[in-house]
Regions:
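Structural motif
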Residues: 5, 48-51, 65-67, 102
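N-terminal beta-strand motif that seeds the catalytic metal site of vicinal oxygen chelate
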Residues: 1-19, 66-68, 120-121
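Mid-chain, well-packed structural core segment of small domains
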Residues: 62-88
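Catalytic core of tubulin tyrosine ligase-like
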Residues: 22
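Vicinal oxygen chelate
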Residues: 3, 10, 31-34, 79-80, ...
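Conserved short beta-strand elements that form part of the metal-binding/catalytic scaffold
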Residues: 28-63, 114-119
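Short beta-strand micro-motifs in enzyme catalytic cores
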Residues: 39-41, 66, 101-105
Length: 121
């Protein structure tokens, strides 16, 4: 069976600001594709694209919609980068009470989307 999640899109107001935000926070390079009014910067995992920062006239960022969560090595360091790039912490690093499950946090990205983080430490 294929992975359960096929693809995700993170809406933007300022596409280039959002790309800079995610590249800096997660230390990745996101290939950019543009087609007329639509723009995408793609998150890749091994050889496949799993999601994108997406800009189109009818896409509106929100902290009230679906939450996409990213794995990271260190939540504290990642949240520091979020703050430096203009994001805000919505829920600080919090222990997941089920034994052995690690930690999570929530932040608002540069566009106002609510995003989650998960880490073992």
């Amino acid at each position: 069976m294929k992975k359960f999640i096929a693809f995700f899109e993170i809406p933007t107001v300022d596409f280039h600001r959002a790309v800079d935000f995610y590249e800096t926070v997660f230390g990745v390079q996101l290939p950019v594709f543009e087609c007329e009014e639509e723009k995408m910067a793609c998150f890749t995992e091994e050889v496949e694209t799993v999601g994108a920062i997406f800009h189109a006239p009818d896409y509106i960022p929100s902290e009230k919609g679906v939450v996409i969560s990213f794995n990271c090595e260190d939540i504290d360091q990642t949240l520091e980068k979020v703050l430096r790039k203009g994001g805000k912490i919505m829920m600080p690093k919090t222990k997941i009470e089920v034994e052995g499950r690690g930690w999570f946090a929530l932040f608002a990205d540069s566009e106002g989307n609510r995003v989650g983080l998960y880490a073992d430490k």
